[in-house]
Amino acid sequence: MLGLLLSVCRTPERPPPPPPPPVVVAPQPTPEPEPPPPAPPKLSIELPTDSRTLRMLDRELLADAGVPLADAQLFPDTYSVHEGVFTFRGGPLRANAAFGTLGAKPSKLSIAWSVTTGQSKAPWFGGTGWTGQPVIVKWPAVIRHSMPKLGAKRQDDALIEVIQGSLDGAVHFIDLATGKRTRPALSTGNPIKGSVSLDPRGYPLLFVGQGIPENKPIGLRVFELINHTEVFFLPGSDKSAPRRGWGAFDSSGLLNRNTDTYVVGGENGLLYLLKLNTNFDPLELTLHVAPEVARYRYQSPGNQNYGIENSLSAFRNLAFFADNGGTLQAIDLRTMSPRWKFEAGDDTDATLALELTRDEQLKLYTATEVDKTGPRGETWLRKLDALTGKPEWEVSEVCQGALAPKKIDAGVFATPLPGTGEVSHLVFFVLSRCPGPENGVIVALDKDTGGEIWRVDLPHFSWSTPVQLNDADGHAYLLHGGIGGVVRLLEATTGRQLATVQLEGDIESSPSVFGSRAVLGTRANRIYAIDVK
């Protein structure tokens, strides 16, 4: 009723004024949506202690007072933001050693250049041994300018540098494009069998594990590459070590760029965590470290064969390694304490390869030698759940070593290669002296079942780890070198041989690849670059 009264009593309205002229508004671009908030940081992996497997494992942590063992000890998912291959098998997962992709489908291998090394004493001489993988880096400009040893190469924006440790006891520096030396070789005093590692932050900091005590105390030597000065020495002869008679470092360590820590295993049986306390000034051309050291020491029931020859694998706060007695362990790096162990049954020198699956499961691939079990026996190829240590499958292969005239071990020395892309369903193993004392095998297994998909029989045994290469269309290939000096390019889906090239000398080392050029050393005092075309 109230609404009706208001309508009746309202004064009649005047006619409305004419509408104002339209206002022309220039079109405005559609506002950009606000970027999503940054993803929360990756959390550490919390694993309960497996009391069943660790029941009789004696372990202790021997640490300098200043070593921080805290939640910050998480490896980033990306090892380096710079271009290159910085450590054995590329990073913490130890999954591959290639940076970049090929262009077109490859069908040819050719030698681009070769460099001759010096020689040490017999029987090591020169060239490269096992594992002997180089690092390859395209230096950030500010870092390149901070290294006077590069000379005129400091101004070369296109420089990609190969850094190769050698059995001659030196580290060699080579221009990937030309094969010419970029700076003087760096003498370490003892033969280098393993693979050097470079600071993934791009800092000119090089870690060199020595393999043979020829001229001076053996251990891990750390060099700054500004003036080629040794800034730290970790002696392999460690009074805390369970194995006192051998102090080699064939293992290639990992540097956590978020925490300034370096983790490495020694053949003396200790696992080391070094808080580096790095102080680098690229303008003043100075780099110093003042490491504080934590040592993880353990004793596993029935295993007196100490020594870590493989390169530690890691994912976030978890690290994985095996020893000369076949004890595999998962270590929480925040506390340097074990979470589980697995007894493989024999010496395990091959580095453990990790894989993060599409459904966020962490898997571990490993294989044993035929060593402590006798000259003839079985090598075991395995897939484990990396969070529990439980095997998901295992496959055995018969191999033949020898006891006389000298002891020769058989089995697997090469790191397993989990396939990616079009071969993401496959994992590749290289077998040495299997089935006979001179033979080798490359075998592709189904990741889910362990079933054999293909195999390639080799006329010679092999210790070298293959590299997976991918072309622009996503097709996958394997590059592999063996005893006898033959480098093979295989179609990864079938094992079909596409190309070969013959090098001088036996190949014990593993290659690194940058783009379509691989670098690989031999025992004939040579370092080669091989083009994959």
Label every model-predicted segment.
Residues P35-S80, F88, A95-F249, L254-K533:
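Extracytoplasmic/lumenal domain signature
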Residues R10-P12:
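Bacterial signal peptide processing site
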Residues R14-L47:
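Post-signal peptide N-terminal segment of mature Sec-exported envelope proteins
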Residues L6-V8:
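C-terminal motif of bacterial Sec signal peptides marking the signal peptidase cleavage site
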Residues M1-L2:
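Sec-dependent signal peptide recognition
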